[in-house]
Swiss-Prot record:
Single GO BP term: cobalamin biosynthetic process
Domain GATase cobBQ-type: 245-427
Record keywords: Cobalamin biosynthesis, Glutamine amidotransferase
GO MF terms, alphabetically ordered: ABC-type vitamin B12 transporter activity; catalytic activity
Name of this chain's protein: Probable cobyric acid synthase
Signal peptide start and end residues: none
SUPFAM superfamilies documented for this protein: Class I glutamine amidotransferase-like, P-loop containing nucleoside triphosphate hydrolases
PANTHER family: COBYRIC ACID SYNTHASE, DETHIOBIOTIN SYNTHETASE
Pathway listed: Cofactor biosynthesis; adenosylcobalamin biosynthesis
Its job: Catalyzes amidations at positions B, D, E, and G on adenosylcobyrinic A,C-diamide. NH(2) groups are provided by glutamine, and one molecule of ATP is hydrogenolyzed for each amidation.
Similarity comment: family membership: Belongs to the CobB/CobQ family. CobQ subfamily.
CDD domains per record: CobQ_N, GATase1_CobQ
Organism: Archaeoglobus fulgidus (strain ATCC 49558 / DSM 4304 / JCM 9628 / NBRC 100126 / VC-16)
Active site residues per record: 321, 419
Gene: cobQ
């Protein structure tokens, strides 16, 4: 069973996007293909139909391949919590918090077996597995415990592409250095380099490409332009790449989580700092939070929070998960996160959220739009899918789905626990209709990136 690995010189070099493109290309050529990333560190997760958590990137690579995401595609997920601590998710199930300084010494041998079994299971079921590496491949201090790069390369023996980001500068040194530092048993697997995110003329790279090929004996398969096709990001780094304009304003909470909920809106959205204003915004969204009560306090004491409350009723205010909780009348913590406290919410919704036990609800759901919520009223009676990852229970009047959400009397303020809401094509159409604009659909970006990669890379070197 053939496999292809997309490794990189750094984090955010374009590995996730390129892996998704190969999933789409192979699927369009008739292969049954699955994505795989042995270990991912991501603030943003996706819940499968079985209620298993995986990194958001692997979920959308699966969609690009035309298949349902499952936990084998990302057997090890680390969700950073701060101070060297991450939540460890193994085969879709949270198994506890780990300190990174102890993680590599205690857990790695067990996790190697988990990774190998997950990969073999996919390899038996699919014609092709597209493997994504993590960070830079040449982390020489981690080679013996580098699950997503060196370990899986040695185990699966895939053809490897190394992608470098020219937009950051130093791409030739990065590609050469990464290849030069690879272990001797991994170097023969490298079949090509890819230069990503070129904003200028390709011909100015020709002499550098020739010299890189001479020094390494490895072909540069092609150069990709700067592609901005709403591929979900794994961490907050990519928020900085969003524009400063847009009619959809997304509140940048200090502890924001699952901001990939809003990637489909990216062309017409911007993040709002707490000291900014709503000028130019026709819709405001309060996103999820890793610490709802702390972010509530920060928002309430800010200029932006005051303006949101003041303008509620004039423009739609939407809350997703933690943002929904923030919009409630009251939040009650029974000792789960901050001790026993009661906090007044923004008061935009007639609802109360209670945190009674440290239990997180993780499930994928499909719901029918029933309530009177601006924008969603355009698709009343239709179904939407999403996933819930939250602590706390909200008691509300005027729900917008059968058993979830709440809307204000005029429908201008509403909230829901559904992550992934804006990845629904009908919701995107409804929002676009309200704003008088058109958003790019999920299927569009998958084909667009596949077309770019097919048209610009010499895939014959890979036998494709």
């Amino acid at each position: 069973m053939p496999s292809l690995m997309v490794g990189g010189t750094t984090s955010s070099a374009g590995k996730s996007l390129l892996a998704a493109a190969f999933c789409r290309i192979l699927a369009r050529r008739g292969y049954d293909v699955a994505p795989f990333k042995a270990q991912n560190m991501s603030l943003n997760s996706f819940v499968t139909s079985k209620g298993k958590e995986i990194a958001i990137a692997q979920a959308y690579q699966a969609f690009a391949a035309g298949i349902e995401p499952d936990e084998r595609m990302n057997p090890v997920l680390l969700k950073p919590k701060g101070n060297f601590v991450s939540q460890l998710v193994v085969m879709g199930e949270a198994v506890g918090d780990v300190d990174s300084r102890k993680y590599y010494g205690v857990k790695v041998e067990w996790l190697k077996r988990v990774v190998e079994e997950a990969y073999l299971s996919l390899a038996e079921e699919y014609d092709f597995v597209v493997i994504e590496g993590a960070g830079g491949m040449a982390e020489i201090n981690l080679y013996e415990r580098d699950l997503p790069n060196i370990h899986i390369a040695r185990f699966a023996r895939p053809d490897i592409l190394i992608v470098g980001d020219i937009d950051r500068g130093g791409v030739f040194a990065s590609l050469y250095g990464t290849y030069a530092l690879l272990p001797d048993d991994v170097k023969p697997l490298v079949k090509g380099f890819v230069i990503n995110r070129l904003r200028g003329r390709e011909d100015v790279l020709e002499s550098g490409i020739r010299e890189l090929e001479r020094l390494t004996g490895i072909r540069v398969l092609g150069v990709l332009p700067y592609l901005d096709y709403n591929f979900p990001s794994e961490d907050s780094l990519n928020i900085e790449e969003w524009g400063a304009e847009g009619t959809v304003g997304i509140v940048r909470l200090p502890r924001v989580s699952n901001f990939t909920d809003f990637e489909p809106l990216r062309e017409h959205a911007r993040f709002l700092s707490l000291n900014s204003s709503l000028n130019g915004c026709e819709v405001v969204i309060i996103p999820g939070s890793k610490d709802t009560i702390a972010d509530l306090k920060a928002l309430k004491s800010s200029k932006l929070g005051e303006e949101i409350v003041r303008k509620a009723g004039e423009i739609p205010v939407i809350g997703i998960c933690g943002g929904y909780q923030i919009m409630c009348r009251e939040l009650v913590d029974m000792g789960v996160e901050h001790g026993r406290i009661r906090a007044k919410g923004l008061g935009l919704l007639d609802a109360v959220t209670e945190f009674r036990e440290y239990r997180k609800r993780t499930v994928q759901v499909e719901k029918r739009v029933n309530g009177n919520a601006v924008i969603l009223d355009r698709i009343r009676g239709e179904k939407v899918w999403g996933y819930e990852i939250h602590k706390g229970i909200t008691r509300a009047s005027n729900p917008i789905f059968e058993d979830d959400g709440c809307a204000s009397e005029d429908g201008m303020c509403w909230g829901t626990y559904l992550h992934g809401l804006f990845w629904n094509e009908n919701v995107l159409r409804a929002l676009g209709g309200y704003l008088g604009i058109k958003f790019r659909q999920k299927e569009d970006w998958a084909d667009l990136i596949a077309d770019e990669v097919e048209g610009r890379l010499d895939l014959g070197v890979l036998g494709l």
